[in-house]
């Protein structure tokens, strides 16, 4: 999950104009390639293309076979030219393309996915982002059997606000962090530690500590608009007695359930992994890196980041973006050293704005309404919170 490194960054949604890029092959591209276990579409695309997100432009699916867009270990891919344009096809050698029906038994094989999904299981099966309305109204665990603070399999937990019948199943999840939306122009000047988000307290209690936090947030121009609340799955239970509180028998779980955990409907729809790397039609305005996983304030290749835009904004699985460090202002100490009385009353004259700096590429692999998760695919520098997303560009 996105741990203590979660930070919140901001924006409002506008879209920039659509863009397109020309397909260029790598100088060292092969003419044939046999897919092996562990391959990803991104990795295969990088063997042939300078820009892997242009995979849809080169992939030539055979419409005469079932699931023509899927690739399996053992498939032979060949580079051919159709109307003078490079295309990648299955089972063909360079030359004239001949499409013909072909039946194969693929029931025991897994199709190649865009990214290594097995390594992202916690983000696919355990984490989710719920809306502020859901966060306020969700039923919650008030106590665990035998007055214990924690409970796990074969224990009964007591849930308030659960309108359900005996036999219904629910997921139990733990509140982690809040994703907030902030102004475009960051009001802080004390480094990333100043913008780290606080853990989400799902109790709803108003304490002096919370009042102080709200006051300091207001003074820092922090917007109160919440993009979503992240929760982490801790178990599944079945209602054995309705009421308030209802009794829920824990059936299985990853962690012990405790008072304060939320009760959510199970996610029934299976994760759709049939997407491929592609460039977005546009980039939502001020789309930023909200948080990074397993790091303090920065992240590198094959690490997960949370992004400040989601399905509502047109973000979809497989979209690839470039990540840039945002513009920043520094003092021109060459022309205006510290203590220069010429800028005592006009300090802005001593400032110079450094341009955005390219950091790497990120591919979206899971979307929620206003937030999405992405995997950093490559980079030349660590990605930090508050980094801004742009259309994908060649490295």
Give the role of each language-model region.
Residues 11-12:
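Short, linear, compositionally biased motifs with a strong N-terminal bias
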């Amino acid at each position: 999950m996105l741990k203590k490194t979660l930070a919140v960054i901001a924006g409002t949604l506008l879209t920039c104009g659509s863009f397109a890029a020309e397909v260029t092959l790598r100088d060292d591209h092969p003419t044939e390639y046999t897919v092996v276990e562990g391959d990803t579409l991104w990795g295969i695309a990088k063997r042939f293309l300078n820009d892997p997100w242009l995979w849809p432009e080169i992939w030539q699916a055979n419409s005469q076979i079932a699931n023509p867009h899927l690739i399996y270990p053992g498939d032979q891919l060949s580079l051919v030219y159709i109307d003078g344009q490079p295309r990648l096809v299955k089972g063909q050698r360079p030359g004239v393309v001949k499409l013909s029906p072909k039946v194969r038994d693929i029931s025991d094989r897994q199709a190649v996915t865009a990214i290594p999904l097995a390594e992202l299981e916690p983000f696919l099966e355990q984490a989710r982002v719920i809306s502020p309305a859901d966060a306020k109204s969700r039923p919650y665990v008030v106590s665990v059997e035998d007055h214990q603070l924690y409970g796990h399999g074969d224990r009964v937990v007591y849930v308030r606000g659960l309108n359900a019948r005996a036999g219904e199943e629910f997921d139990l999840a733990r509140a982690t962090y809040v994703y907030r939306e902030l102004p475009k122009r960051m009001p802080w000047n004390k480094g990333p530690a100043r913008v780290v988000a606080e853990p989400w307290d799902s109790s709803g209690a108003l304490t002096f500590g919370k009042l102080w936090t709200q006051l300091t947030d207001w003074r820092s121009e922090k917007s109160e608009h919440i993009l979503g609340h992240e929760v982490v799955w801790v178990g599944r239970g079945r209602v054995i007695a309705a009421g308030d509180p209802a009794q829920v028998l824990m059936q299985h779980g990853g962690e012990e359930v405790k008072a304060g955990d939320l009760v959510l409907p199970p996610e029934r729809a299976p994760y759709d992994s049939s997407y491929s790397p592609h460039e977005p039609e546009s980039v939502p305005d001020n789309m930023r890196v909200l948080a990074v996983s397993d790091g303090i304030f920065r992240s590198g290749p094959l690490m997960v980041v949370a992004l400040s835009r989601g399905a509502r904004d047109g973000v979809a699985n497989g979209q690839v973006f470039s990540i840039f460090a945002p513009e920043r202002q520094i003092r021109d100490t060459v022309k205006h050293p510290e203590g220069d009385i010429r800028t005592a009353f006009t300090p802005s004259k001593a400032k110079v704005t450094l341009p955005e700096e390219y950091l790497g590429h990120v591919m979206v692999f899971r979307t929620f309404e206003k937030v999405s998760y992405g995997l950093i695919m490559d980079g030349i520098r660590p990605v930090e919170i508050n980094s801004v997303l742009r259309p994908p560009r060649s490295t």
